[in-house]
Amino acid sequence: MGLLALGLIGELLGGLVIAQAIAGAKLQPWPLSVAVVGDQYTAGIENRLVWPTLMAQRTGWSVSNFALPDAGFVADGRGGHGFTYQVDRAQVSRPQVIVIMGGIADARFPDVGQVRVGALDAVNKVKVGGERVLVVGPTYFETPVPNSVIRVSDAIKEVAEKAGVPYLDALDPPWLTRDQMRPDLKGPTDEGQSAIADKVVAWLRSEVAQ
């Protein structure tokens, strides 16, 4: 085989490798696009910045926040606020990852079976939509954590584990202190939002790297 032919084959093979590298790169677009579902701990109450915004600033990811106050897997706020509805809206933005952070509003429902059903519905909806779902349990601001909140966290964890979905426990220990909460204890201060961002970013970095 002549030198010219060998040179042409080399160029073709080199072009193929480059094309494959480009194709592979397209499977992992950057920045990572993340949609967040949650309650007032995520939506914020008169905060300058909330943890999803801080996460975007600290990582360079594209983050959309769909959280609404008093929402949960069962709790529905003013109507249409529940996590299943938030997932619907989040999917319209076509994110790669949907992070669902459990809220404390579900703790007022005595039947945790409802929480399991709601959590399974939200998780399955994301999986069917083709996005990757990661679940963070509800957090709190003091110990001992009320049993009602622990029961909700355990129910969500059970659903996530059975569904093969990554779950981050935010109660052992609680991520917040009373000083990081508003005076009415309804949501985190800016300092509390930053504390939540620290925890979620560290965990999410490790998960998306897998």
How should each PLM-predicted stretch be described?
Residues 1-37, 41-46, 57, 91-94, ...:
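N-terminal secretory targeting modules
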Residues 82-210:
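Alpha-helical cap/lid subdomain in secreted, periplasmic
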Residues 31-36, 41-118:
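Conserved SGNH/GDSL esterase-like catalytic core that processes O-acyl groups on lipids
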Residues 20, 26, 49, 151-153, ...:
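Residue-level detector of functional hotspots within protein domains
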Residues 16, 22-23, 72, 78-80, ...:
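Mixed-charge, polar/low-complexity N-terminal
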